[in-house]
């Protein structure tokens, strides 16, 4: 197999990864970075309705394991534009990203709403573009529930898991996150707060205002420092 054939095969494999999984391993720059996209709705134990763009957690988990175990991959970049989705699936992915030992960065583009917030803060460094937004609101549930105190306690425990994770991986306190989550003066017929990029940084939810070049520059610096 000659060099030209190898390049063609590598290009075809890269194209398939982007089309099928929304991922690519960037190997033509200074360092080898694995790029993972989280878009649309985060799909967990149940399939999303037809026509919705989704990120399937059963596709993402093996990619994160591979990024951790592959010695060629030096860093991880997670690009986010998500409306949220399954709470347990989102938290599972956030915990996995947080446990990757290699330099990692997240970049919020467009939106990082709901359970997308733990994902946005899960890496070593988080970035957000000025026009992106993040909606902080309480846990929701669709479908029939039992109207008993135990159900309410279950919701409270689930919310505490999210709040605790966000506080542990960002500069925002649990109290401030809860205050923003329960705010009633902003969303119509709902509670919560919408943060744009600058306010997300000001509130210490996100580390830095910036774009792709800023996130890659930080990753390169961390890789070289190691």
Model-identified regions with their sequence ranges:
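N-terminal organellar transit peptides
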Residues: 1-117, 121-137, 141-226
């Amino acid at each position: 197999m000659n060099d030209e054939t190898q390049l063609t095969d590598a290009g075809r494999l890269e194209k398939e990864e982007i089309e099928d999984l929304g991922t690519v391993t960037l190997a033509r720059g200074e360092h080898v970075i694995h790029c993972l996209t989280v878009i649309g709705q985060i799909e967990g134990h149940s399939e999303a309705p037809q026509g919705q763009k989704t990120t399937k957690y059963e596709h993402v988990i093996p990619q994160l394991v591979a990024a951790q175990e592959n010695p060629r991959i030096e860093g991880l970049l997670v690009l986010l534009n998500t409306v949220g989705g399954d709470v347990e699936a989102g938290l599972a992915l956030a915990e996995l990203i947080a446990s990757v030992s290699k330099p990692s960065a997240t970049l919020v583009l467009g939106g990082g709403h709901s359970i997308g917030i733990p994902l946005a803060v899960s890496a070593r460094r988080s970035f957000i573009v000025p026009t992106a937004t993040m909606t902080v609101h309480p846990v929701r549930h669709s479908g029939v529930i039992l109207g008993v105190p135990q159900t309410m306690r279950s919701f409270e425990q689930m919310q505490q898991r999210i709040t605790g994770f966000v506080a542990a991986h960002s500069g925002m306190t649990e109290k401030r996150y809860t205050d923003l989550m329960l705010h009633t003066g902003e969303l119509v017929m709902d509670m919560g707060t919408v943060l744009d990029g600058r306010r997300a940084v000001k509130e210490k939810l996100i580390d830095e205002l910036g774009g792709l070049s800023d996130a890659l520059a930080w990753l390169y610096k961390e890789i070289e420092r190691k």
